[in-house]
Amino acid sequence: MDLLLDLAAADPRLRVIKLEDEPTPPKAGRLLAADQTLRVLGGLGGEMLIEELRRGCVGTMTGFGYPEILVDIVRRFRSGDREGATIVFHRTCPLIRFENQAALNLPIRKLIYQRRGAIACAHVRAPGPSLDAGTVADLDDLLGRLGLASA
């Protein structure tokens, strides 16, 4: 934390910080309490987005198969609809959690992007893993339960 604050103090052009060192909400709060000219973004797949927003983060910068959901959460929160933002966030948490599985996050996200027409191929280069049939079935089940297009 001190290093980030020292860097920000040394160079006035450094105004935006992306936090990915857990726990992000209290760290964001401490950074912003020390320097209110900073803009802090969360990361880590959006897992702590609501808590980061509550601590003063301006948004998140992360990969996610449905980025429009994260945009909706941030817009609601920033417009004053904190309850609506929280409801959307908690409704989507199972997908955020599922997509953030270590080593599987990129193949899961690429499969979602392919199904949504954003990319042509979901293949992950070596040494990245491939998704097994069970993981794909779990993803399909989750997307169906959330009412999100899976194909």
Description of each model-found segment:
Residues 37-41, 111, 128:
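Helix-coil boundary/capping segments in enzymes
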Residues 59, 79-81, 113, 120, ...:
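Short alpha-helix boundary/capping motifs
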Residues 118-151:
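Flexible C-terminal active-site loop/helix
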Residues 53, 94-126:
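Conserved short secondary-structure transition element at the edge of the structured enzyme core
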Residues 1-93, 98-101:
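Catalytic alpha/beta core domains of metabolic enzymes, predominantly
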Residues 62-64, 80-85, 106-109, 140-146:
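Short, structured secondary-structure boundary patches
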Residues 71, 90-93, 107-111, 137:
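A generic structural signal for well-ordered alpha-helical surface patches
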